[in-house]
Amino acid sequence: GLNLMLDPSFFIQQTERLSGTIVLVVSDEENVFFQEKYPVDILAFDQWGGIQVLPELLSAFVVPNHPVLTGVLSRASSILKEWSGNSSLDAYQSCNPNRVKLQLAALYEAIKEQHIAYCTPPSSFGDAGQRVRLSDNVLSGKLGTCLDLSLLYASCAEAMGLHPLLVIIQGHAFVGCWLIDGTFPDAVNDDPSLLTKRTADGINEVILLEATCMTDGNNVTFDTA
């Protein structure tokens, strides 16, 4: 097979979308037997390409192992102890959806305490997808879009051992999480009934959350969000 040598340092330096062409040539010293050009778009390191092409790549911006999350998780643990007397971020070990929901509520409050302001998406010259503020930038800059906040919450939830969900609709994003130790078999689903069935009264296998309710000055409770 053909071994393409890609330079990681080149890609990580890209701050804007870059369009180019890959030229494939099959030849010997005298003759060209085949030549074809293929357009290629290189996205910036913080750019998601949108739902049209490999939408599952959005999950690459969920960063549960980032050290910047430690402070948020520690605060969530403290809140959990205040509420229940048990500070353990024990994920699904209790086999109790209400315990999982309590952990998610504590995380919600911990992020609210960060006083993050809502803002519009970062400017991008590309018309596909969106520029994403990574979790460390959201926490340090105190700014975030609905997508940025959803990714931050999902990153923290996964760091807690939970299974978050990202939900994308026209012009908006929000976040969810499994209340039981489950996942969907596929990385991407476009059937909304898969969520409505699992969030229905009496089922409560999945919870959905409006992430912008965590922004500064917003007094919306976790249950309302």
Residue ranges and their predicted role:
Residues 101, 105, 140-151, 169:
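Conserved structured core elements
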